[in-house]
Structures are given as structure tokens and as C-alpha cells.
From Swiss-Prot:
Activity regulation summary: Inhibited by UDP-xylose.
Positions with a binding annotation for substrate: 157-161, 216-223, 256-269, 334-335, 447
General function of this protein: Involved in the biosynthesis of UDP-glucuronic acid (UDP-GlcA), providing nucleotide sugars for cell-wall polymers.
Name the UniProt record assigns to this protein: UDP-glucose 6-dehydrogenase 4
Key words, A-Z: NAD, Oxidoreductase
Length: 480
């Protein structure tokens, strides 16, 4: 029986290995992690991550050919293929701080693999890594190999949280990069045969190592670029009276452009987009391409601008102060159908409002109070380091309360901010919410999911990104 081990039981490693176990019953799959609480959660009825469809797959395969363990060295030693899915956070100190990827955990994993291995192995990069990382990993393995042979492959993930299981079942493509040597081609073929159990051959793309590594960074940069492009247009729409939804639709009907990722919003979030673009910027700078670096840096700048613009719109609309005013935040996760809060725009919006001394009440159906308080008290980039390296007891932000009910969150509020596009927010009783709010009652829709006309009929003053402005808002422009 072929044995696969994945180092890292996070948002990528867990779902990916669960689907491989489901689709390949003849392969034994072990997911390992040094975090005891995380592995305990994977072995319980309450999985550590929320992903539609994941629970059923794990329950179906766990204990048969899918195992979760903290015995990292044992499972690495026994594996034929080792996936490495550890964090590659942005460096916070030293050379490249604020831009470069921190490969500390990757290097540590590589050294451990070399140390415990007693047979030849295929080592697969699953984490998003800078171009040429495979070369560095090869050197570490080669100089510590004790005669054992390793083949390095790049197999980047292209999952979208909230639809990860569907993405794994029916991927647009599976990308495998390897060395262009007989041994490299053989390793690529071995991994290709795993995916061929359910992915059509035409959707499995093979490239050299460097192309595969760069393709992942490029894909995320292109997606984020589309979001920043439509968000830049949303600012212009507000200034001219155009409707960004109509503009996006008109643009998206062009077959050369398409309609995906053209929804204006408060900004993009998630673990990958900003981190990968900053990494891309750093790689361009290191390769003597300052103009290219500056081009990609603008994608991040527009995203920051959009979040700042949203906060400024809130404050300026409410008589230029939110001091001691209750502001309800509906949604804290970076997108619907996930509990992931990494780089969520809600963090920056909340911090901006807290800076103006607002009292914030937050409701999200999948994010815990502990996580919200941690996010609002943590320094930038610290979130992407393992939990045991984060502050043990983050400071509680006293101006923030977290509820498990949207109506409780909005009671006596001066304003409601919709920051995650959860479906349930569309069907709330907004007449009830309006009746229990301070007047004038404001709604700031950061995801453009609200029925604006209906809300205005109820009596709300509504701001929706990129839409024609409410007369009230026209008199109080937002300045950045």
C-alpha cells in the first residue's frame, strides 16, 4: 500500500488529504502536526476548520485509510510521498521584513525529513512558496540525506475557502512541477497517478519546478488584481453617479474578461492574496525588476485604500464622529462559508472605528469571541505563525463585544456594517432591526448584498459600495 504523509493539518493539508483518502481507498494517508489541540480536534466530532462537506468525508475515512497524528517522525519515516503544507508567513523582522516569505517552518520540516528518512521519498511542496524554494530544499535534503534519494515536486493548491471540497472534487487543473530529469519525470508520474483516480488526465498539468512555483503566486496576484481593479472603479462610480454593479456586469459580459471576481467590496482578505503579492514584490525587487514590483504593490495599496475609504465613509456620514456610538459589525470572517479570519478586512475596519472610539458589537456565525479578540489585539503578520508562537493571552479590547445573535448585536446601534456576505444577513428582519436602533439609523454594506431600496423604504440611510449615494451621504463626502 502506498503511504502518503502530510506535514501540516491546516486549511490546505486537512481537506486535501481527506479527499485523497476518499478518492484513493488503496492509499494510506496520515496528516501530522505538532499541535496537539489541532490533531485532537481532527480526531473529534468538532473539526478545527469549517468547510462545507468536510465533516462527512473525514467521518467516512477516518480510522480506515485517513489518520491524524502528532507522531510526525513516525509517519514521515514510513511515507513514500511527503506533502509539506506548513505556514510560510510574511517575515516580521530581518531581511525582507514585511514582504519576504518566512521559510523557517519549511526548512525545519525539510531537515526533519532528511533526519528521519530511511528510504527514498518524493517531497511535495503544497504550501505557497517563493520561486526557487525547491532548489534550497534540495540542497538541505542532499547535504543531510545519508545516501537516501529525494525528488522535490511542486504541487500548489488552488482552493477557495468555503468551496474547498468542491474545488478538490472538480479542480480546474492540478499542477505538478518537477525536475526535467528521468528521476524527476518518474516522480511527477507517481503523483499524477494519485490524482488520476478522479481528475481527468487533461486537467493535470505538468511543468518544470520553477513554473509551478511561480504559477501559484501569479494566479493569486491576478485574482487580487481583479478585485482591486473593480474596487478602484467603485470609488469613481460613487463620484460620478455610476453603479459599479452595472459597470461590472457590462465589463464581465466581454468573453475576454469574464464575470468572476468583479464584485466590488470593502476589500479582499484571506491567508494568501496579500502575503503572496508582497512575496511577489520582494522577488521582483531581488531580481532587479523595480517597475514590476511597483506594479504589483499597487494591488495592495488599492486594497488598503478601499478599507480606509470605507471607515472614513462611516465616520464622515455619522457627523464626523463615532465616539461612544455603538456600531454593529455583521460578519468577521474574510468571506462566507468559512470561519477563517486571516487578513479579513473586518480587522482593519474595526481597528479604524476603534481608533475613533466607537463601541463595537460583532456577530459572525462561525467565528469565536476568542478569535475575534485575538485578531483585534495582534500585531500585523503575527496571525500566520503557529498558535504556540502567538501571544498566549491577547489583550481583550474593552470597546468590543461579541454576540451570537444578529439582533442582539444591532440593538441600540447607531450603525450596522455588513463585512461578510453570509446568506443569513440577506434575510434578517430589518424592520425589527431599524425599530431597535438609534436614529438616524445607518447601514454600510461592505459586500453589496443588501436590498438598498427596501432598506431606504424602512428608513435606513444606506451606503453601498460603488452605488449612487444617498442624498445624506452626498452632503458628507468621505476623505482618505
Amino acid at each position: 500500500m502506498v503511504k502518503i504523509c502530510c506535514i501540516g493539518a491546516g486549511y490546505v493539508g486537512g481537506p486535501t488529504m481527506a479527499v485523497i483518502a476518499l478518492k484513493c481507498p488503496d492509499i494510506e494517508v496520515a496528516v501530522v502536526d505538532i499541535s496537539v489541540p489541532r490533531i485532537n480536534a481532527w480526531n473529534s466530532d468538532q473539526l478545527p476548520i469549517y468547510e462545507p462537506g468536510l465533516d462527512d468525508i473525514v467521518k467516512q475515512c477516518r480510522g480506515k485509510n485517513l489518520f491524524f497524528s502528532t507522531d510526525v517522525e513516525k509517519h514521515v519515516r514510513e511515507a513514500d510521498i511527503v506533502f509539506v503544507s506548513v505556514n510560510t508567513p510574511t517575515k516580521t523582522t530581518g531581511l525582507g521584513a514585511g514582504k519576504a516569505a518566512d521559510l523557517t517552518y519549511w526548512e525545519s520540516a525539510a531537515r526533519m525529513i532528511a533526519d528521519v528518512s530511511v528510504s527514498d521519498k518524493i517531497v511535495v511542496e503544497k504550501s505557497t512558496v517563493p520561486v526557487k524554494t525547491a532548489e534550497a530544499i534540495e540542497k538541505i535534503l542532499m547535504h543531510n540525506s545519508k545516501g537516501i534519494k529525494f525528488q522535490i515536486l511542486s504541487n500548489p493548491e488552488f482552493l477557495a475557502e468555503g468551496t474547498a471540497i468542491a474545488d478538490l472534487f472538480n479542480p480546474d487543473r492540478v499542477l505538478i512541477g518537477g525536475r526535467e530529469t528521468p528521476e524527476g519525470f518518474k516522480a511527477v508520474q507517481t503523483l499524477k497517478e494519485v490524482y488520476a483516480n478522479w481528475v481527468p488526465e487533461g486537467q493535470i498539468i505538468t511543468t518544470n519546478l520553477w513554473s509551478a512555483e511561480l504559477s501559484k503566486l501569479a494566479a493569486n496576484a491576478f485574482l487580487a488584481q481583479r478585485i482591486s481593479s473593480v474596487n478602484a472603479m467603485s470609488a469613481l462610480c460613487e463620484s460620478t453617479g455610476a453603479d459599479v454593479t452595472q459597470v461590472s456586469y457590462a465589463v464581465g459580459t466581454d468573453s475576454r474578461i469574464g464575470s468572476k471576481f468583479l464584485n466590488a467590496s470593502v476589500g479582499f482578505g484571506g491567508s494568501c492574496f496579500q502575503k503572496d503579492i508582497l512575496n511577489l514584490v520582494y522577488i521582483c525587487q531581488c531580481n532587479g525588476l523595480p517597475e514590476v514590483a511597483e506594479y504589483w504593490k499597487q494591488v495592495i495599496k488599492i486594497n488598503d485604500y478601499q478599507k480606509n475609504r470605507f471607515v472614513n465613509r462611516i465616520v464622515s456620514s455619522m457627523f464626523n464622529t463615532v465616539s461612544n456610538k455603538k456600531v454593529a459589525i455583521l460578519g468577521f470572517a474574510f468571506k462566507k462559508d468559512t470561519g477563517d479570519t486571516r487578513e479579513t478586512p473586518a480587522i482593519d475596519v474595526c481597528k479604524g472605528l476603534l481608533g475613533d472610539k466607537a463601541q463595537i458589537s460583532i456577530y459572525d456565525p462561525q467565528v469565536t469571541e476568542e478569535q475575534i479578540q485575538r485578531d483585534l489585539s495582534m500585531k500585523k503578520f503575527d496571525w500566520d505563525h503557529p498558535l504556540h508562537l502567538q501571544p498566549m493571552s491577547p489583550t481583550t479590547v474593552k470597546q468590543v463585544s461579541v454576540t451570537w445573535d444578529a439582533y442582539e448585536a444591532t440593538k441600540d446601534a447607531h450603525a450596522v456594517c455588513v463585512l461578510t456576505e453570509w446568506d443569513e444577513f440577506k434575510s434578517l428582519d430589518y424592520q425589527k432591526i431599524f425599530d431597535n436602533m438609534q436614529k438616524p439609523a445607518f447601514i454600510f454594506d461592505g459586500r453589496n448584498i443588501m436590498n438598498v431600496n427596501k432598506l431606504r423604504e424602512i428608513g435606513f440611510i444606506v451606503y453601498s459600495i460603488g452605488k449612487p449615494l444617498d442624498p445624506w451621504l452626498k452632503d458628507m463626502p468621505a476623505f482618505v
